[in-house]
Amino acid sequence: MGKLIELLLHPSELSAAIHYKLWRQPLHPRDLSKESTELRRCYELLDVCSRSFAAVIRELHPEVRDAVMLFYLILRALDTIEDDMTLSRDIKIPILRDFTKCMKTPGWKFTDSDPNERDRVVLQEFPVVMTEFNKLKPKYQEVIYDITDRMGNGMADYVIDDDFNNNGVDTIAAYDLYCHHVAGIVGEGLTRITILAGFGTDVLHENPRLQESMGLFLQKVNIIRDYREDIDVNRAFWPREIWHKYAEEMRDFKDPKYSKKALHCTSDLVANALGHATDCLDYLDNVTDPSTFTFCAIPQVMAIATLDLVYRNPDVFQKNVKLRKGTTVSLILEASNVSGVCDIFTRYARKVYKKSDPNDPNYFRVSVLCGKIEQHAALIKRQRGPPAKTIAQLEGERKEMALSLIVCLAVIFSMSGLMAYIAYVSGFRWSPREIFDSKMFPLRD
């Protein structure tokens, strides 16, 4: 009920939600009749692990769809081992360091995960995953083996790092390194798959900083947003080099008396994340396949919108904040091309700037970064020119106009009905005859 009220209060988001549900068609729908039982099961496992990622992966070009899906499941299996607090280091470390050997062992699976681990089913049915993995083109297998090996060893390093586990991240350099191991390496793997498929320009290969920024931007936004969730279980991913400028202990930010310092700290972290935004735009500008572009763009526009949500928001320190469903759907529909993504980044950069407080020590830095994002987005749009509209897009716009009218009328009638109901339960009574007889509104003398 709450989500419905949210949509009614934001008619444009309601319109987007209806459009997404009724008319949006994937560029490359799956043909289930050509899929093996094992492959269909892998996509079911993908749904178990992440419905949001499952939706965008399913819409990828057939050349890379299965490779990306299996890549995700394998890394999810690896992550499940690392996150399982019921497993001892003696069990975890050998598996994490030698996970590629496990992948090459016929029939290997792991059944000793915590029963409360939702994703343990991937480890339990790992032979099904590997059956389909072994059908991939060797070039994609090679990338996945390499990234999995590096991620597994990186995870093992953090598992045995007592200083990290007890004290969290110390410096900004260590913060970047952690985000690299968690997300940057994944971005490298996806970029290599994209290049091998011929879906990206040489710029992606020649400038690895772009793929690194894609991963770091996403991870840093998640880390800022998840402050309360992490601090409540004694995890700390905000770098001490930043937060210690504003408090003695990171958990102090939960206390309302530190609210001003807490907001200054988030603005410092937001500025750090915003530094990756222009690289993200450059990366997306060099993805040539439409479905791969959408796959890459959707997480990035969610990230910039989330950054606006957490910026100078005291709720971050009291609960886990997240975007409205309607906002998410609107962003998905808008992020269909480079021009749309540039518009989104510009819009949210302006919103961040407008929220800025001149008394915040990070005010100037945030303002400059927002200006750079807006200028860079404008440059990319100018170089590209206006995107040509297809017949399908024009038809979609006509449907959108009709839908907007329907939604507006629906909202008007819904609100009118609600007001009439409130009046009725409050004791007001009237009839059409009273209105026409002017008894409700007697003429003045």
UniProtKB/Swiss-Prot annotation:
InterPro entries attached to this UniProt entry: Isoprenoid_synthase_dom_sf, Squ/phyt_synthse, Squal_synth-like, Squalene/phytoene_synthase_CS, Trans_IPPS_euk-type, Trans_IPPS_HH
Protein EC: 2.5.1.21
Catalytic reaction annotation: 2 (2E,6E)-farnesyl diphosphate + NADPH + H(+) = squalene + 2 diphosphate + NADP(+); 2 (2E,6E)-farnesyl diphosphate + NADH + H(+) = squalene + 2 diphosphate + NAD(+)
PROSITE patterns per the UniProt record, alphabetical: SQUALEN_PHYTOEN_SYN_1, SQUALEN_PHYTOEN_SYN_2
Pathway info: Terpene metabolism; lanosterol biosynthesis; lanosterol from farnesyl diphosphate: step 1/3
SUPFAM superfamilies found in the cross-reference section: Terpenoid synthases (SSF48576)
Annotated membrane topology: Multi-pass membrane protein
Its biological purpose: Catalyzes the condensation of 2 two farnesyl pyrophosphate moieties to form squalene. It is the first committed enzyme of the sterol biosynthesis pathway. Required for the biosynthesis of ergosterol.
Name of the featured protein: Squalene synthase
Species the sequence originates in: Yarrowia lipolytica (strain CLIB 122 / E 150)
